[in-house]
Design a protein with these regions (language model features):
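Histidine-centered copper-binding motifs that mark active-site loops
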Residues: 1-169
Length: 169
């Protein structure tokens, strides 16, 4: 029995694969600058991650942990196509964004989960500037710990009639 398993509970390896053999190495997250109307493809899938002297099996968006950082301008709309090659059904929750309910990523409430091998298309609007994040809302204890999360940077709409303020992100 796995030393982390609780009495009466099966070890996690009985539920989720753990072997990293043959998996691509996880990469660092890319900074993706998206314009209004752009399409983004996010692929969820297993990756190998080196942690000191051990290689472990994790999950990534587009092969990276964390997932890509998305940089958009306030008021933009982006189409996000998510394909699930992960371990279990999933959704993507766009944490803190005000958006259409059907794209909020709450399983069985606002969206049917994306099955393994399936896809879902989100239409995401960015009404407010700020720093946000995205992540699954199914088995968060597992999926986020395995690497499924990423940042969203929403830049404010430039104010007209005044000189722009220097911004460095």
């Amino acid at each position: 029995m796995d030393h982390h398993a609780q009495p009466g509970q099966p070890a996690s390896a009985e539920f989720f694969p753990t072997d990293p053999t043959g998996l691509p190495e996880a990469t660092r997250p890319a900074l993706l600058e998206l314009a209004d109307g752009d399409d983004l493809h996010l692929q969820i899938g297993p990756v190998a991650k080196r942690l000191e002297d051990t290689t472990v099996r994790m999950l990534g968006y587009n092969g990276s942990i964390p997932g890509p950082t998305l940089k958009v301008r306030q008021g933009s709309e982006v189409i996000v196509h998510v394909t699930n090659h992960g371990d279990l059904e999933t959704t993507v929750h766009w944490h803190g964004l005000r958006l259409e309910n059907k794209y909020d990523g709450v399983p069985h409430e606002t969206q049917t989960p994306i099955p393994v091998g399936g896809s879902f298309t989100y239409r995401i609007r960015f009404p407010d500037p700020g720093l946000y994040w995205y992540h699954p809302h199914i088995r968060e204890d597992y999926t986020q710990e395995m690497g499924l999360y990423g940042n969203l940077l929403v830049l404010p709409t430039p104010v007209t009639g005044r000189p722009p303020t220097a911004m460095s992100f």
